[in-house]
């Protein structure tokens, strides 16, 4: 295991040729990794992944994933952490052979490993060598990753060079916001349809008539915990609470939220009506992209469109400030509301790689098959709901 505790020790790019030390860790050993080194790796990773931030992962292992069999491969150079591959054996996809699945749950929505940008080639070469020679699991599945991200571009090239097998499954488009050269006005005219823009402006006018509206951004240690609790309450009061999918529906999930969405990682943006939040959006970031995995709004104001208003105000704020370079909707399915406001997208999928091509192909087929079945079930339920709604109600004698 890596035991060096120097707070800001990061090997230079010139150390690429230094011997890479690899350790296979269980959950307890993962939790014991030097915090400063894990944090430094997260900030300097080739492809940003705040879902594998130390606070997210350790909160997960202590709450929603407590008892789950989790492992990791750590890569170090000169005592400094330069790579971290987090995985689990459990998966929603049954396979007839062992698979290292990227660590995932309802809240960890990106399986991209953390690889130091200055040591990426060496770490990837070492990782694939371990996979080929039996020093690591022989087949890996990385869920919900950006196919165009630098890590997977390098991985794919290295896999091809070694003759290993590569496949992708369950593709979808994720909304992604970047700045247009023409600024906010160009964004509004090119990204939003005329009807959408009219709806937004009508919504803003109606909200303004209802009271004083303002956008609030909170990320400091003093105020953030209170706004996290406000978000949990707001989310639970709506349809997610009724469906049992809100954070507060399960004590472990609520504890995860309070432990992981902390200052230094998380921020909360709120649409305030007369000082009270009626729509809230959670974001996390470790570099220059904000990932927004959760949004909630007060359903008593549903007709006023608070969610739409918040999205619009955040677009305005994005162009008015340069704190971040991009926003990732962090949704694991298409159809996210941000698609109406964001100008770009990422090509997302599950990446599968391994030594045996038949295993890789079979696992990709299983992933795609489960996704197809899931969509058919959802379509069937939607049709059933429509029929129940359309069915004539029986006369009731009075």
Q: Which residue stretches match the model-derived regions?
A:
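Active-site/acyl-donor-binding loops of N-acyltransferases
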Residues: 2-25, 89, 152-185, 322-398
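A conserved beta-strand-loop-helix scaffold within acyl/acetyltransferase catalytic domains
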Residues: 21-102, 144-174, 181-303, 396-397
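Short C-terminal domain-edge/linker segments immediately following a structured domain
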Residues: 54, 104-105, 114-119, 170-176, ...
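Acyl-donor binding region in acyl/amide transferases
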Residues: 69-71, 77, 90-171, 285-353
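Short intrinsically disordered coil segments
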Residues: 128-130, 190-197, 365-373
